[in-house]
């Protein structure tokens, strides 16, 4: 997934409109809902600093410029997601369902490190 190096990695609502959609947006935040099924993959995209809330238990492989990272997250996990560029794939047997609360006033430079995966 070398495309994660691209500075043009886009808005996930544009790169994967079948998986991401905006549920709330104002001048301070944008809330995205993400859903996919086992085996689904996303194109490289970027997130600003965000809070991630998992609404299902799932397994994912995240592809960053610096490598990959496998994550297992349980329903109800709430964590900080630093600004980053990545692509992902559902490596489990259950659908993924997540809310991202993206901060609009974030000035952080997106990370391309596997260590930037959800905390």
Show where each model-derived region lies:
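N-terminal low-complexity, Pro/Thr/Ser-rich intrinsically disordered segments
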Residues: 2-16
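Local beta-strand/beta-hairpin segments that build beta-sheet-rich folds
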Residues: 14, 19-24, 108-109
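Ligand-binding loop in jelly-roll beta-barrel domains
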Residues: 57, 83-106
């Amino acid at each position: 997934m070398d495309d994660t190096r691209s500075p043009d990695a886009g808005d996930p609502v544009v790169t994967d409109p079948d998986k991401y959609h905006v549920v709330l947006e104002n001048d301070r935040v944008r809330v995205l809902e993400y859903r996919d099924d086992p085996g689904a993959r996303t194109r490289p995209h970027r997130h600003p600093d965000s809070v991630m809330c998992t609404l299902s238990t799932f397994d994912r492989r995240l592809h960053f410029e610096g490598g990959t990272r496998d994550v297992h997250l349980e329903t109800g996990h709430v964590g900080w997601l630093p600004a980053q560029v990545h692509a992902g794939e559902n490596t489990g047997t259950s659908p993924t369902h997540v809310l991202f609360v993206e901060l609009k006033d974030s000035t952080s430079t997106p990370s391309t490190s596997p260590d930037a995966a959800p905390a």
